[in-house]
């Protein structure tokens, strides 16, 4: 038995953003068709390090994608000049259970998070949308913008970040391609935007109804716990709300949990993107829409499967004998 090992560069060469968006669409359709097995993620806390390790398995029956992602969050690593978040994705042979490929998870996590926003933007943002606001300038900001440019012709980029230095560095990378503006207030960054991408760890709402366009589409991917929220209750109550998975969002998304508890948003009115993709009956492109994603293992494995196929096709990686 051999296990193929991919370097970060191998992974980057083996998938494009457009391929990742297509993989997201197929994964969520399979979820809606109940063709996936998606157990709850398992967390192990390492108290003495104030750290956490998460294990996220999944199986997509249609294309026989079986595997898991393991991610560790060790904040103290920063004192050793090591990344605080590390992880791997392993795919298994769905016929034999044998492990077949191992790859770094950090890049693919950012890519698939961008890709799911790209998928939502493809179907819910105006066709002529050309102005995007990126709220937050961390690891997700680049792939969020990359995904927007994969599905819309973006001309203007507005940036807001709590850390001005990060915003300036991000903007510098974009100046040759877009009309870029850095704003000191979120309200100024979002007021003219057709598309808003929030990728922050905020515990207080950043986006409010009076500050956005009536047709704005919002991708909210930063908050992933009950104590975090990026989108105001007034926005959620006024908009069509679409989520990756209702069960996951009602467990992990602070703003959605609050909106449902306060009856600002009715649970039965929340759309799951996979269910909508099955019919595509209603067009929301001229309305205010919010897409909320907390991340699912099927997203990781679906992009990893694309990487696996392309790596084999292009003979990338090395085979390591393990027995």
What are these regions (language model features)?
Residues 177-261:
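Rossmann-like adenosine-cofactor binding region
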Residues 132-133, 289:
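Conserved beta-strand elements of the Class I
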Residues 150-174:
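NAD(P)-binding Rossmann-fold cofactor-contacting core
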Residues 141-142:
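N-terminal Rossmann-fold NAD(P) dinucleotide-binding loop
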Residues 229-323:
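Adenosine-phosphate binding glycine-rich loop
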Residues 137-138:
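Glycine-rich Rossmann-fold phosphate-binding loop(s) that bind the pyrophosphate
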Residues 124-131, 213-214:
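Short helix-loop-beta connector
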Residues 1-109, 118, 128, 298-301, ...:
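N-terminal ligand-binding/catalytic initiation module
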């Amino acid at each position: 038995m051999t296990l193929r090992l991919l370097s970060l560069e191998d992974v980057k060469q083996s998938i494009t953003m457009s391929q990742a968006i297509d993989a997201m669409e197929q994964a969520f359709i399979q979820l809606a068709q109940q063709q996936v097995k998606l157990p709850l993620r398992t967390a192990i806390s390492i108290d003495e390090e104030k750290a956490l390790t998460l294990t996220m398995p999944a199986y997509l029956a249609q294309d026989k994608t079986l595997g898991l992602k393991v991610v560790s969050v060790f904040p103290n690593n920063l004192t050793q000049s090591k990344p605080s978040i590390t992880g791997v994705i392993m795919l298994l042979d769905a016929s034999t259970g044998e492990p077949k490929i191992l790859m770094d998870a950090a890049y693919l996590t950012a890519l698939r998070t961008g890709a799911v926003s790209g998928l939502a933007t493809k179907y819910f943002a105006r066709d002529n949308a050309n102005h995007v606001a990126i709220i937050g300038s961390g690891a997700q900001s680049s792939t969020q913008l990359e995904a927007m440019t994969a599905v819309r012709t973006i001309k203007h980029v507005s940036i807001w970040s709590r850390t001005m230095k990060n915003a300036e560095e991000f903007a510098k990378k974009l100046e040759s391609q877009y009309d870029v503006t850095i704003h000191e207030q979120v309200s100024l960054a979002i007021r003219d935007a057709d598309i808003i991408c929030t990728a922050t760890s905020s515990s207080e709402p950043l986006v409010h109804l009076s500050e956005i366009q009536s047709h704005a589409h919002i991708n909210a991917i930063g908050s992933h716990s009950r104590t975090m929220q990026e989108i105001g209750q007034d926005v959620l109550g006024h908009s069509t709300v679409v989520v990756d998975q209702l069960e996951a969002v009602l467990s992990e998304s602070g703003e959605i949990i609050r909106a449902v508890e306060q009856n600002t948003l009715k649970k039965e009115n929340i759309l799951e993107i996979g269910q909508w993709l099955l019919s595509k009956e209603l067009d929301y492109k001229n309305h205010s829409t919010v897409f909320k994603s907390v991340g699912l293992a099927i997203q990781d494995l679906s992009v990893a499967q694309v990487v696996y196929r392309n790596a084999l096709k292009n003979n990338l990686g090395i085979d390591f004998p393990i027995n």
